């Protein structure tokens, strides 16, 4: 069964609706994102999540600070979109937080090799995502070539992201990854989730 993470949740009412529907729910604390929430807003969002596993997502906050914010708000996972050092994993463990490192796809990168290296870390999962600045589109509107996703999907606890929508999710589900990660693909507007799209996504990956 493919797990599902819905990311970029900014409204408590969406967190309530998604709780127990998505396996993971992501809260972005990142000034560069249109779906960013302030750290002080995390507690109310986190408290709305009882059945799903909450995740703090960031890229530019220093790893130690991100882990501290997560621990303070009882968020067990930090998905980190920049470089992590061994000491960061060690520190996260002392705070009861697990890191989810990210392999960012750019044309020409040895994606499989990068994912294999990240899988050697004490990870919650390894996310494969596209460069946020990239405008490239591949099969079904995906931001990463399907052939490359097929190479990394069976390697371990690998989550796939990058342009996934209810319309193309079946392409990803056929690869049987550990998880798919979707934000804008199930939205009415940035940060506002559309439950009809969420249900369509779940149906596309065989969860409904």
From Swiss-Prot:
Its EC number is 5.3.1.24. Keywords: Amino-acid biosynthesis, Aromatic amino acid biosynthesis, Isomerase, Tryptophan biosynthesis. InterPro entries: Aldolase_TIM (IPR013785), PRAI_dom (IPR001240), RibuloseP-bd_barrel (IPR011060), TrpF_fam (IPR044643). Disulfide bonds: none annotated. GO terms for biological process: L-tryptophan biosynthetic process. GO terms for molecular function: phosphoribosylanthranilate isomerase activity. Belongs to the TrpF family. Pathway: Amino-acid biosynthesis; L-tryptophan biosynthesis; L-tryptophan from chorismate: step 3/5. HAMAP family: PRAI. It catalyses: N-(5-phospho-beta-D-ribosyl)anthranilate = 1-(2-carboxyphenylamino)-1-deoxy-D-ribulose 5-phosphate. This is N-(5'-phosphoribosyl)anthranilate isomerase. It comes from the Archaea. SUPFAM superfamilies: Ribulose-phoshate binding barrel. It holds the Pfam family PRAI. PANTHER family: N-(5'-PHOSPHORIBOSYL)ANTHRANILATE ISOMERASE.
């Amino acid at each position: 069964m493919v797990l599902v993470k819905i990311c970029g949740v900014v409204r408590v009412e969406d967190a309530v609706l998604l709780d127990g529907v998505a396996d993971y729910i992501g809260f972005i604390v990142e000034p560069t994102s249109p779906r960013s929430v302030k750290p002080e807003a995390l507690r109310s969002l986190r408290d709305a999540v009882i059945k799903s596993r909450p995740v703090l997502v960031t890229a530019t906050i220093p790893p130690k600070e991100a882990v501290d914010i997560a621990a303070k708000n009882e968020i067990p996972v930090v998905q980190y979109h920049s470089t992590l050092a061994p000491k960061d994993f060690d520190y996260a463990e002392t705070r009861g937080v697990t890191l989810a490192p990210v392999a960012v796809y750019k044309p020409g990168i040895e994606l499989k090799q990068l994912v294999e290296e990240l899988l050697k870390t004490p990870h919650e999962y390894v996310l494969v995502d596209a460069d946020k600045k990239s405008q490239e589109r591949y099969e079904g509107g995906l931001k990463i070539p399907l052939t490359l996703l097929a190479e990394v999907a069976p390697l371990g606890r690998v989550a796939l992201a990058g342009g996934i929508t209810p319309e193309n999710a079946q392409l990803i589900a056929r690869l049987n990854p550990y998880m798919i990660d979707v934000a804008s693909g199930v939205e009415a507007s940035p940060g506002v989730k559309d439950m009809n799209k969420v249900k369509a996504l779940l149906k596309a990956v065989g969860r409904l």
